[in-house]
Amino acid sequence: MRRRKFLSGSPNHIYQRSQNGSVIFYSLEDCLVYFTVFCTCAKRYGVTVLGLCEMYDHIHQLVEAPDLPTLSGFERMVNMTFSYEYYGDLKRGAEGFVSDRNITSGSVSVTIPNIGHLFQSPFGSAPKIGNKKIRTSIAYLYNNPVERNIHQEAIKWRWNFLAYAFS
């Protein structure tokens, strides 16, 4: 396995894809649970969050961690805790344990298989060195919903938290 690049004191662009390109966030609750787990783990691990964007099938983060073991531990805990909650919700269906669950969101009905890992492993990361690369990474992270044609305005996409960012 390749050694992960890391530079202490520099922001790292972290990207985490779903297994097989499947949807991660089906509901408002899924997004809020991930955000809660992410924020709780960031505080616990002493990770500074510069940006977060939850997409339907992947996640982008821009974070600063004091060292590589802290960053890896943080990502492991976020993914493990969210996966536990995600699959726990699937298993706590109306009939107890179910092998799959039909989730209805508005007029769209989707069946979620309850097999395997939720996220691809390992997570991807790229340290950002220098103001230009940091700014470019922030713009990429927050503009991802526009580039993927999910929303017309980045600031109005509720799951990139751009409306709550400050300079």
Would you name each region that the model predicts?
Residues 1-167:
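Short catalytic/metal-binding and nucleic-acid-binding patches
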